[in-house]
Amino acid sequence: DNVVDVCPGECRLCSRYKECLLSSTVKETRSVVDVELRSVQTDYVLRGFTCPNKGKELVGRFPENMKSRFQYGPMTKAIVADLSADGAMSMERIKVFMNTLFDFNMSDGTVKNTITKGAKLGKEFTEKVKEAISKSKVAHFDETGGRYMGKNGWFHIAATKLYTMYGFHQKRGKEGIEALGVYSNMSDPSQVAVTDFWSPYLTLDGNNQKRHAFCMAHLDRELQNLIDNYGNPACARKMQKLLDYAYVEVQKLKGEGRTEADNNLLDEVSFKYDKIVTAALNKYKEPKKTNKKGRPSKGKIRALFERFRDYKDGVLMFLNDFDVPASNNTGELAAKGLKTKLKVSECFRGVTGPDDFCVIKSILETARKHG
């Protein structure tokens, strides 16, 4: 954009300076990248003409997007929306930021309306994001709590390598998951939903035939909890070691350009897996029924290894299908961005506040993934 010639000081006052400058050689270039923080006001002046040929008065027309006597332009609106979603700033802080940096006189209402209108314009795009995730082979799901107008609610997340979709609902379970409109629409047997073991994900499917893969990071934390707080059981140590071994082997094979594991590795891991689970369930027996109301507690160790038994295919899916990741990292990273906003803003204003945020955040995260 700009070039500054750094010349010897003694040459600048010389009468032949310009002549020497033209024949000079570049020894080194150093760059400074900066920004110009200034607002630009464009006035649209509506003019009327009296036609000299017909004597008619002709008046110009403002552009379609010029709805009022004063308004902020698309770049300003984009900055406000980005500060709200990616910057995790409250409306009050956005107002102060914009007014300080650009010498605006922006009000709380202007900030809120800008975000709401931006979200309205972006809804068509988020429908396409929703459709793309619903048709993907592998999708990650997660949820995290939030507050709006002093009430509790839940943000539901669906994500792939290229798309991220956020939605807000008062309920955490079945109603909230279905309202997002992604999980329930994955009905192809070749599709995979990567989740934790939260029960609504396992019971919501009905007749849908998609496969379930379970997050290794969650399982590793549960196994570590047994090791640290429940007597360091051998079955937990062995299972943790086996899953780590399987993960490392898969990463090695992927690094070599392989697209699947050989039968020897599959048989080895499967055999050891079954052996560990069987030994654990034999040692930590099903509790006997008592006269007390309700089901007797199985205990943490048996409950976890029953899940290992019942959901073996989902736990080891990363080993059997290299397209399936070993963790729900994609979903958890998407949730992490929300938690930053919730910590800063604490509570969303207005009924549409969380929904507006979800639309804008979905657009920004998806755009970032596409470069």
Task: Give residue ranges: language-model regions.
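Short, flexible loop/hinge motifs at secondary-structure junctions
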Residues: D1-S68, F141
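Catalytic center-proximal scaffold of phosphoryl-transfer enzymes
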Residues: G48-T50, G55-H370
